[in-house]
Amino acid sequence: MSHPHPELKAAPPLPEGGMRVIALGGLGEIGRNMTVFEHAGKLLIVDCGVLFPEETQPGVDVILPDFTSIRDRLNDIVAVVLTHGHEDHIGGVPYLLRERSDIPVVGSKLTLAFLEAKLKEHGIRPRTVRVREGDRRGFGPFDCEFVAVNHSIPDSLAVAIRTRAGMVLHTGDFKMDQFPLDDRITDLRAFARLGEEGVDLFLTDSTNAEVPGFTTSERELNPAIEQVMRTAPRRVIVSSFASHVHRIQQVLDAAHQHGRKVAFVGRSMVRNMGIARDLGYLKVPSGLVVSTKELEKLPDHKITLVCTGSQGEPMAALSRMANRDHMIRIGKGDTVLLASSLIPGNENAIYRVINGLTRWGAHVVHKGNAKVHVSGHASAGELVYCYNIVKPRNVMPVHGEWRHLRANGDLAIRTGVDPDRVVIAEDGVVVDLVDGRASITGKVPAGNVYVDGMEVGGATEASLKDRLTLAAEGVVTVVAIVDADTGALAEAPDFLARGFVHDDTTFEPVIPVIEKTLATAAEEGVGDARQLEQLLARAVANWAFRTHRRKPLIIPVIIDA
């Protein structure tokens, strides 16, 4: 099993007739999935998603793949193929189309509908190509065949990419639910047929590679959801991803069965469910869905609300309800159902929301106390099954953290794949498929690109570190007026502190330290204001840590008298 070396350099030119594969996101993390395929001088991109920030990234809205390595080759991109409509696969497309707006975007009907609604908010009219399972389309030197796969969102697709270098099969996100709500199963016959033709490189979903057995069917959630609808004494508030059409269908069915009306809450939820309903993916009995205004006329035990916020997002509807910052007020007897998984890194935010809801008297039903969620990803048994029918010559696990990628690679080896042909890559690692063998040949830039409000890429790791320091340690501004002739303090320095323990006398002990620092600088001939500010910042920082065990952000200002 090959792993990326930390000292990887830039990759050499791609040999003629070969194919280059570079993941710019989705490896070593759950999110911002984006894979670039290069062949015959052209580029094909599969997915372009976002990653949601952790608590250590304050102020960040989303994290994008790094487009640096393809920015000077935008005209070589023949298409962006989208496997399905989740944010971690389509959320980055608006930012890529800002770089070149006429890139063809390829996807299924629901995927493109979700994307077009998103792009409308960005003022972008995309050039789209609608495909469905069984279709085969050419994009430059890439011959793409689309295969139905089952996932937690309708219309998901795998893609087989044929070139002169060989065939690559990318599963996208998938599982093998044999009793899916929409009766659309993963097309294992197509996988087997492609395997017989010869799959030279298999890129497959690693999310649940550590989980033994097979992923539970979505239908097994029906009893728990129905029980909530049947036994809840007052309102039922269901929180889910705004794109989880299957789960929301189950909620609608259960609400209808028990005589409840349903209202959607949250802009993305209202938008996406409207799209799914219009396209026929969400079946809504007449009169079931009403506006929140109409709910005011109904008794509480006849009300169900479906909202966003299952991951504790601070601006989502459920979080605002928990904080009493929403028109819908949670009260005693309400039941809140968190009908989604807990994404790693969001635990603290979710538990804060649960505690807030509980504080106001709600009963919270979640994965920890009821069977209200199943994964949308294949477990180890399903992955082994796929390896055995696809029989790939080379394997590159995708979509997962390091432990998931490694576990998936181990499964491939157990099914007979040569360990030397299992490539464990990470974001930015270059994998070349040449003469039927996949190998790591180099690396390209693949850092985090932060979206902060309207600004893309302005926030850096250094600025995020400053934000964390501000939050944890506070900030101290020191203004020192210095005699231009002597270099000594002309008067006592001014201090302005925020988030740092202090009173009127807090900074008196540091004044002699500042005086000594400036005197030493004068003796050594240091007169440049920037250098003096650095010395001043260091002196105050050392004093703050020595006396208060704190590391505030120090902002020094030197003014010549």
Describe the residue ranges of each PLM region:
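His/Asp/Glu-rich metal-coordinating catalytic cores
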Residues: 2-81, 86-298, 316-329, 348-352
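Conserved hydrophobic residues forming the short capping helix/wall of the S-adenosyl-L-methionine
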Residues: 119, 412, 544
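Short Gly/Ser/Thr- and Asp/Glu-enriched loop/turn motifs at secondary-structure junctions
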Residues: 132, 426, 550-554
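Broad gene-expression machinery/nucleic-acid interaction feature
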Residues: 141, 156-158, 302, 473-477, ...
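Hard-cation-handling environments
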Residues: 210-526, 533-534, 538
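C-terminal tails and terminal domains of large nucleic-acid-associated
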Residues: 525-561
